[in-house]
Regions:
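Basic/polar, cationic surfaces and motifs that engage anionic cell-wall
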Residues: 3-11, 82-223
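Active-site-adjacent loop/helix surface patches within enzyme catalytic domains
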Residues: 1-123
């Protein structure tokens, strides 16, 4: 399952945050406004309306507002599931997360990390439920993803996050290097070139002025 190239614009991104929609197994209209990529119950992928570009750097109008106060530099990927779910006692509701969805999520996140050269750590690849603990940004009791209905032995945000990261790293290891631009490296190179283009005339004038001053001082001493 390959992500279409136009889903991954060439911009710097810092992290991937994974969610569930608390909805049906299909992507709703509201879901498409909130996330960059959605994974439906059968593993099918749906592109959200906001481009990842809008969340690069300072957020821009129309960005994907998927995580409170943590949208800048963050790619939002969400599983379409868990409508009516209850945290305690745990009840996955009528639309539980499926193993097929989870497996598709792993591939999607691995592809994003590979393309954007995001190193997999608890602060760069995490679930919404981990944001408050891992990044120190309050999230008002969000618990997605802290349970895997298809595997009841995995309980808690940290356990689910560790499973996510472990599987993403394994998937990345089996992926070939993508023949695409590195968003972070290319963006930095472009910014550096623009800065150099702007500064070079100033530097040249400064060097010229300094050289002329040096010549005048030498001539004074000779005379």
């Amino acid at each position: 399952m390959a992500l279409p190239p136009d889903w991954m614009p060439n911009v710097p991104m810092k992290r991937v945050i994974c969610h569930w929609t608390a909805g049906l197994h299909s992507a709703g209209e509201t879901d498409k406004d909130a996330y960059h990529i959605l994974v439906e119950g059968n593993g099918g992928l749906v592109r959200g309306r906001p481009s990842i570009t809008l969340n690069s750097g300072r957020v821009k109008s129309g960005y994907a507002a998927h995580t409170l106060n943590c949208n800048s530099g963050s790619i939002g990927v969400s599983l379409c599931c868990m409508a009516g779910a209850e945290e305690r006692p745990f009840n996955a509701g009528q639309y539980p997360m499926t193993r097929t969805q989870w497996d598709a999520l792993i591939v999607v996140v691995a592809a994003l990390c590979k393309y954007y050269r995001i190193k997999v750590t608890p602060k760069t690849v995490l679930s919404h439920a981990e944001v408050e603990r891992n990044l120190g940004i309050e999230q008002r009791g969000k618990w997605d993803v802290s349970r895997l209905p298809f595997d009841p032995t995995v309980v808690g945000a940290r356990a689910c996050g560790d499973r996510l990261r472990q599987q993403v790293m394994a998937a990345m290891g089996s992926m070939p290097d993508l023949p695409v631009r590195s968003g972070r490296d290319a963006a930095l190179e472009t910014a550096f070139r623009r800065l150099l283009d702007e500064l070079w005339p100033i530097l040249a004038r400064g060097l010229e002025a300094g050289f002329n001053t040096l010549v005048r001082e030498i001539l004074k001493r000779i005379r």
